[in-house]
Amino acid sequence: MSTTLIVVGVIVLVAAVVVLVLDARHRSARSRARREWAGRHSARYAVADPVLTGQWRHGPFSRGGAGTALELVSGEPDGNTLYLFDLEQGGAVVSTVLALRRPTTSDTTVELRLGSEAATTDGDGAAASEAGMDLLGPVGSRYAFTNDLESARRAVDQRLVLTVEVTGEDVSVLWAEGSWALAALDITAGPQRWDEVTAILARFAELMRLLPPVRHP
């Protein structure tokens, strides 16, 4: 019996070591890809930033909190600040986030969620209400949620529908918040996809100029 337990213990230990080695290799490859992408875009790379994500409240941040930005790339393509990072919440990486600063700031937030993301409510829209968001309606293959129905309707037109349709199902949510356009992307996406979603974000940010800007006294 004791011999069997020893064998089982050894097997478990070996399996744990293998998992750790594979995870380390994955992280190393991920870090290398992120550094190379930063280099190609004349951007900066940082291993982590625990402060950056505190400015956002919607998208994946509405469920798991601010979390931490890992494997962060920051730059200014076309003069606008861009961030690319892996979002860690509760000790696990839940998505890759791209954030592009918009030329204007608005108090109106617009989220475009996949049907599966919209269905995470309890059927009565509880999850949307908790974040102060109301269902605006379908926009192409996604569902739009907002904190200001009247203002958000200004930004919904055929151009937005076309942008939604080319976004891809690996983007769980596309949203405008404050002075940012953001996308939550599947963590398995690579450099080519990061480029594609960056271009989609630029288009989305331009369309969100229709949201009413914050007016300072």
Where are these regions (language model features)?
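Transmembrane-cytosolic junction motif
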Residues: 17-41
